[in-house]
């Protein structure tokens, strides 16, 4: 979707007969805020930034996004130390408003939480989406902006041109071999989920 904003020829090659039938169909829809990844990693950077952008994407594309917030419960001092580590990770990663809360606030936010919980990491920026709705909205927007969608086209092979993957001219560097036809391209983004290897 983002690349469709530029003067490029783009093709989304999908193995299945429609979008979101791979790893996306098993996604629970929780938009993680970014307190889990180790600070400084690419995952930390894209996780926190992605969570931040979901509100904008929802407005632009018309899918439902709700900032539900999340709690990670702790039941003893060891858990509290782990929650503090997650809080520090999150703050380093740019996650806003993380805090450690006590039993009273836990039950104010979630009355059915375990009565044994002594503390929790509260993260108000965590959100929830329907992963199918997001994938469909993003692809529809991309197609409306000139992206080609090739379905039922599992990639059987990727051939690299003699110039190699770093060829200097404008000729295609890669050929994706699929039963639906071959796709020649200069750049290849592998977003195949579990089939990406």
Language model: regions and residue ranges:
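Helical element adjacent to the flavin cofactor pocket in flavoenzyme catalytic cores
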Residues: 121-187, 191-195
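Active-site substrate-recognition segment that forms the wall
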Residues: 1-5, 31, 56, 61-66, ...
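Dinucleotide-binding Rossmann-like beta1-alpha1 core, especially the glycine-rich loop
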Residues: 29-109, 118
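Hydrophobic anchor at the start of a short beta-strand
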Residues: 8-10, 97-98, 188
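Short loop/edge segments at beta-strand edges and connector loops
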Residues: 14, 67, 101-103, 151-153, ...
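Short beta-to-alpha linker loops that shape the active-site pocket of alpha/beta-hydrolase fold enzymes
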Residues: 16-18, 106, 138
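Glycine-rich FAD pyrophosphate-binding loop
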Residues: 4-26
């Amino acid at each position: 979707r983002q690349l469709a904003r530029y003067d490029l020829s783009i093709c989304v090659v999908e193995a299945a007969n429609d979008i979101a039938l791979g790893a996306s169909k098993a996604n629970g829809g929780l938009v993680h805020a970014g307190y889990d990844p180790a600070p400084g990693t690419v995952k930390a950077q894209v996780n926190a930034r992605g969570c931040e952008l979901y509100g904008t994407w929802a407005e632009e594309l018309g899918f439902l996004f709700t900032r539900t917030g999340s709690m990670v419960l702790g039941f003893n001092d060891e858990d509290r130390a782990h929650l503090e580590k997650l809080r520090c990770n999150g703050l380093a990663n740019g996650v806003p408003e993380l805090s450690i809360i006590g039993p009273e606030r836990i039950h104010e936010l979630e009355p059915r939480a375990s009565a044994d919980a002594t503390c929790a990491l509260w993260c108000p920026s965590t959100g929830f989406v329907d992963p199918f709705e997001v994938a469909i909205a993003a692809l529809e927007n991309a197609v409306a902006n000139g992206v080609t969608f090739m379905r039922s086209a599992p990639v059987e092979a990727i051939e690299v041109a003699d110039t190699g993957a770093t060829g200097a001219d404008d000729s295609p560097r890669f050929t994706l071999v699929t039963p639906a036809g071959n796709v020649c391209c200069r750049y290849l983004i592998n977003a195949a989920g579990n089939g990406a290897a």
